Amino acid sequence: MAKHSQHSSPPRKLFDTLNDLWQRAKSEAGLSAEGPEGTRRRNNLILYLLLVLSTLYLLNGYQTLRNEEIPYSEFLKAVAEGRVEQAVVTEQTISGTLKPEAEGESTRPFITVPLWNHELAAELEKKGVKYTVRYGSNWFSSLIFNWIVPIVLLTLFWTWMARRMTGGRGFLSIGKKTRIQADTAAKVTFGDVAGADEAKQELRETIEFLQNPTRIQSLGGRMPKGVLLVGPPGTGKTLLARAVAGEAGVPFFNISGSEFIELFVGVGAARVRDLFEQARQNAPCIIFIDELDAIGRSRGGPVVMGGHDEREQTLNQLLTEMDGFDPSVGVAVMAATNRPEILDKALLRSGRFDRQIVVDKPGLEDRVSILKLHTRKMKLAADVDLRVVAQRTPGFVGADLANAANEAAIIAVRANKAAIGMADFEAAIDRILAGPEKKSRLLNDAEKHRVAVHESGHALVAEIVPTGQPVHKVSIIPRGAAALGFTLQLPVEEKFLSTEQELKDQIAILLGGRTAEELVFGESSSGAQNDLEKASEIARTMVCSLGMSKVLGPLTYGRRQQLAYLSVEGAEERNFSEETARLIDNEVRKLIEEGLQRVREILTHHRVTLDRLAALLREKEVVSGEDVKAVIREAAS
């Protein structure tokens, strides 16, 4: 009876040895490490292998391309003429180098396909050619460089791309990219969200449904399937969603709408299915989709890529999942967008996103609360009044206020102050509104005088017209990309409507700078370009959208697609005739000309005040609103 060997076969031993060496190399290089560091190292290794193999492949191809292919007859002629320096003869090819044809030239590498010739060796010896004969073919190197190396390169490149797209978790996990917020992460609660009291009140009901879903079921109702947060950028929509999860104490699945769309077809739908499957397994929980418009755009647009639209497939899967899951399991779907106008109607119907909560720009009291929240860890000087700061930042959202507080801290540090003062907040607000000061942009005396007259015209008209907002500051220090000066007005109170008189006063204030230049210098300059654009826009809105034209009457003309929360206007649909267009142009021109005539009368009547204000502005470069009022009172007395 034959005995079986206790030793493994040589191939098996070789495999085990190579495997041990590979595992040891992985351990020493840190490739087995878990987490982002291990992923980064493995991705780098794949990238290095790609570079090395690509270099070898290119070098082999370069070596092949260097050899000039010549006919066999030309090779025989070169041998006969003694122009062959050396040769390598195989069964398939003859390669080598030809001697330089002239002094100073280099040798020429060549390759040719031979015919069977017994006299070739004798001829080479006769001419003194160094030659080598190699039996067998180079099939192995051809196999390596023509097949194996390209396949390995493509495989490594595909693997590297897949790992980058899936966060380093491998190709098979490409449809699973949902991130769940770790329980150890710092919890965000409503105490960390200032303002937005109405939104927080509605979201508290969502928290109650998550914590006690049977309460509404006992009355025969059901908890809302979806909550959509809409509002301008920076108002805290994502922060509110995190606060809901923190208050409810449930897992929080957070994914951006853009993460559903990848290079591969079907990935978006797979990620939607995986997202809802994870949510069911971790119920009660919250699914939060940020920037929903990335996948929720209305269907029916132009067909792309041969009739298949990955975004529409992802949206269809999302609609199916929101219809299919049971609301009694305690899964709340929340989403945020600042473009609700472009969302698909099927996504917004009842039974999917039942509630739409507007997170709008904060009012005065909310801005005070937000400033207190963002400055609670800052060292503030005694002269800082956050209510005054809030009054001077109308239209600022939470992100803008946080940026203003941080800019004030940076300015205070730059000045080596022990605490942040009111002047630092003023400088920070000016920087955000008008851009940083350009002290290197020096104006000559003539330009400085013209800018001072221009800004004085704005400020003077703003203080004289009946509904003008008070002037807070006038400056002729260049700021931002192109502004050579600015006049800052701040409202006394929050306003949500504008009357016809207020709009006409705004046009007059905008035309004040150009008219002041014409009055003092006899001509205007290019500095009034932006003023004219804004004045023309207000006048056209009055005529076409607000019905403030007696000739055209209370009608609207033209339909323009608008993104309300982004202040972006699309193409205008013209729904009026050429004759009406001429009437619109005439009415707009009439409003502008009436404004110009009105401003000329104001500035002519207050010419002394204009000159004094311009002189003060040239001297100080920055004049406060109190100084402007003092000059007006002094000139009037």
Curated annotation (Swiss-Prot):
Homohexamer. Disulfide bonds: none annotated. It is found in: Cell inner membrane. Acts as a processive, ATP-dependent zinc metallopeptidase for both cytoplasmic and membrane proteins. Plays a role in the quality control of integral membrane proteins. It is a multi-pass membrane protein. The lineage of its organism: Bacteria, Pseudomonadati, Pseudomonadota, Gammaproteobacteria, Methylococcales. The gene is ftsH. In the central section; belongs to the AAA ATPase family. In the C-terminal section; belongs to the peptidase M41 family. Its cofactor is Zn(2+). Keywords: ATP-binding, Cell inner membrane, Cell membrane, Hydrolase, Membrane, Metal-binding, Metalloprotease, Nucleotide-binding, Protease, Transmembrane, Transmembrane helix, Zinc. It is an enzyme of class 3 (hydrolase). GO terms for biological process: protein catabolic process; proteolysis. It holds the Pfam family AAA_lid_3. Its EC number is 3.4.24.-. One of its GO terms (cellular component) is plasma membrane. This is ATP-dependent zinc metalloprotease FtsH. The chain crosses the membrane at residues 45-65, 142-162.
